[in-house]
């Protein structure tokens, strides 16, 4: 389920108060124990520790820190030749559904760019798909990056093709840290 609004397309994250661009890293989280504190109780929509069983988990962090700004759980989907987004959400302080005072802009687009990047690495040319959490979010993804509404497996299922996914990759810049 995807609970992310795309507020701005920025090459990094943008501090909502100062407008300053903040450099980021993408970190793959392999230790389930680390994910325990990212759960429904504290605004992360699901228990991320459980998602690590069948997915690769990636976090957008401020460069040089473990200050997580968003999480995404993905898995390759060979039948659809795309990456499947199992879950995606921003940190509560970046979630416009939870706070009026956002800390960083650009987290949502950043998370989608990570998925497109991993799709490229898997040989799927950037294609990705998943289930939006609501009709409002589905319409938002159609508008923001020309997602196609599929609605086959879920009423808000969508697909982003290779060309539109590559447009995301042209915007976002980050360092990978998969250690």
Placement of each model-derived feature along the sequence:
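Non-catalytic substrate-recognition and accessory regions of acyl/acetyltransferase enzymes
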Residues: 1-102, 110, 117-129, 136, ...
